[in-house]
């Protein structure tokens, strides 16, 4: 294999690894979101051993994804030279992964505190649960987390630590990531504008207000004549009063 062929193979291998990391980051976001949603039921009337087993399984999946993603991103950042086209993409994944780890660690700390307040080690412990009015369970959320797959989840086996050790491991992981790789957080630029779905062009809001007033317009039929009520453009309160009258 000559130098050109070796270079092509290296580029293809690196792109494949970057794509795997992107898919893993998406998977991690889904799993941690499910874990966070399930944690909101701790201490409520739907809490129980089944919920905590589901959370433990979800935490195990998140730990496997984090371990594999950390190793691959670290390897990529230490191998990629300055100026390579994949460098910005990998650095962006690195920053997103840092943020995801910090958020996940905060959720783990909250879960640890709630499990200490509501231990559920004995039958009488259920008397301390708060009746929040929630119905059903979190099996659907746990099923979504269980369906999440990563490119290396089936071939790499890692032992998931207990909750306390997991929190401590993330501290060590974050410190290692910040020390071994010099990626200034402020130097990483986003690929899309923030709150794109919430932005609007000038004039859109005014058109929406006008259409709302048209929908709220109340027609009064009297003596075979139709007249509009509250036609003034600032008469929103009057429209509501007309509807309530």
UniProtKB/Swiss-Prot annotation:
Question: Which key words tag this protein in UniProt?
Answer: Coiled coil, Signal transduction inhibitor
Q: Which domain of life is it from?
A: Eukaryota
Q: Provide the coiled-coil residue spans.
A: 71-92
Q: What does this protein do?
A: Regulator of G protein-coupled receptor (GPCR) signaling. Probably acts by regulating the activity of some 'R7' family protein (RGS6, RGS7, RGS9 and/or RGS11).
Protein name, UniProt field: Regulator of G-protein signaling 9-binding protein
One GO biological process term is: G protein-coupled receptor signaling pathway
What family classification does the UniProt entry report for this protein? Belongs to the RGS7BP/RGS9BP family.
Taxonomy of origin reads: Eukaryota, Metazoa, Chordata, Craniata, Vertebrata
Q: Which GO terms describe its cellular component?
A: neuron projection
Supply the source organism for this entry. Answer: Danio rerio
């Amino acid at each position: 294999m000559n130098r050109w062929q070796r270079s092509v193979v290296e580029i293809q291998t690196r792109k494949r690894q970057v794509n795997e990391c992107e898919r893993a980051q998406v998977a991690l976001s889904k799993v941690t979101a499910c874990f966070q949603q399930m944690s909101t039921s701790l201490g409520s009337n739907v809490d129980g051993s089944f919920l905590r087993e589901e959370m433990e399984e979800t935490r195990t999946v998140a730990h496997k994804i984090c371990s594999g993603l950390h190793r691959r991103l670290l390897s990529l950042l230490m191998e990629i030279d300055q100026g390579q086209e994949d460098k910005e993409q990998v650095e962006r994944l690195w920053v997103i992964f840092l943020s995801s780890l910090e958020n996940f660690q905060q959720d783990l700390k909250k879960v640890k505190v709630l499990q200490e307040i509501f231990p559920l080690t004995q039958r009488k412990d259920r008397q301390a649960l708060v009746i929040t009015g929630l119905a059903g369970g979190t099996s659907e959320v746990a099923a979504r987390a269980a369906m999440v797959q990563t490119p290396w989840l089936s071939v790499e086996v890692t032992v998931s630590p207990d909750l306390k050790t997991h929190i401590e491991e993330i501290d060590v992981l974050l410190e290692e990531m910040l020390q071994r790789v010099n990626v200034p957080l402020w130097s990483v630029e986003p690929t899309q504008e923030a709150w794109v779905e919430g932005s609007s062009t000038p004039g859109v809001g005014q058109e929406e207000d006008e259409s709302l007033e048209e929908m709220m317009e109340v027609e009064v039929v009297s003596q075979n004549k139709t007249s509009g009520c509250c036609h003034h453009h600032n008469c929103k309160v009057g429209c509501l009063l007309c509807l309530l009258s």
